[in-house]
Amino acid sequence: MKEPQMMEITTLVEAHSAGARMTAVVIEYSDAVLGEKLRMEDFQVEGYPIVAACASDTPRGTVARTGRFVQLILDEQNPATRLCQMGEDRRLQINRPTLMVTQKRPIEMASGKQAAPFEQQASEHMDAGVIDRFLTASFTTKTGQTLRYNLYTPEKIVRGQKYPVVLFIHDLGSCSEDVQAPLLQGTGATVWALESDYGRRPCFVLAPQYTRQCANDDFEVTWEADATVELLENLCDLYAIDRKRIYATGQSMGCMMICEMMLRNPNFFAASLLVAGQWDPARMAKAKNETLWVVVSGGDEKAFPIMRKALYGMRAAGGSLCEAHVNARADAAMLDALIRTQNNRNCNLNFTWFEGRSVIPDGLEVHGGMHHICTWKKAYDIKALREWLFEQRLYEGRISVHD
């Protein structure tokens, strides 16, 4: 009978509001490990402190008494666990390191045997969970321009049924040559896919990747804005997508691009969740009948005053506007309750801002951009906002309505 041995090593990655991070290293053995005998001191991941070790039945399974997988939980406070780093050219760099793992002492198996120690074995695989469920592809427009994108499809598609699609557009700081950057920079794309995976609100999720700035403070956009709408139209023809439930959301530059797409393509989006961005108040009045929820920080020196002016202009033109401010540090239940209260007023335009510096975590130095950047780290965590988006749908003659 063969002696127990190590089979392979995998690094686990989780999406996070502040950027994807490596959370654990998983060692697969040929035989079941005895969990109660495991000690984190028996292992080493070079350069990455371990805070716990446990056995499980699957790579991402819960703690088990015995299991063929040993999860080495990494210290989340270690900056090296973060995959996203800002490069010298102010472009997002994605780091996918190969971790080196050592088992210092023999490991007790459930059979009574031992797995021999090993030194400096490489983690050859990276399991990024829901991020890996996105396919990566490219689209060529009618004018010959190429746009790369990530697309999540519902795990179970019922024949004859159509599903909503969520378009997520990233910020300027996430511009990168790495097509997966929109999925790794935060949760603006992955949160919808994760809920779909759990069977809640199944949907498609589209996350294009832009390599350069596509919208500026002069309210100008590049060809990528029209190309993204063309891509959406193409996907609607290829997949079981409900054209009455095309949703858009974006942060900073992404918010700005969606505003322009909305102006150029009225009645295209059923609703838009716009985070930490602003657009031309002189033109936004034309979108008075669109369905929007705008979330900014009260300390955001651009997004707060400019988008408020735009929304007031939309109200003056005939739109129905509801406003509220919330403390970003309130617990999840309170934030959901506040958003639902605002939603109950049945406005097609909603404006919510985070009070004071509440969006900025303690311990972080406050500078001009912190209110801005921290907004989307919080906004996509609010379940009631995600629920609101999926309640909307188009009907003949426009304004989107609740299901």
Feature-to-residue mapping (PLM):
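Primarily recognizes the serine-hydrolase "nucleophile elbow" in alpha/beta-hydrolase
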Residues: 237-238, 243-288
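C-terminal catalytic histidine-bearing segment of alpha/beta-hydrolase fold enzymes
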Residues: 298-304, 320-403
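Gly/Ser-rich "nucleophile elbow"/oxyanion-hole loop immediately N-terminal to the catalytic nucleophile
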Residues: 157-161, 215-252
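Active-site machinery of serine-nucleophile hydrolases
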Residues: 163-165, 172-229
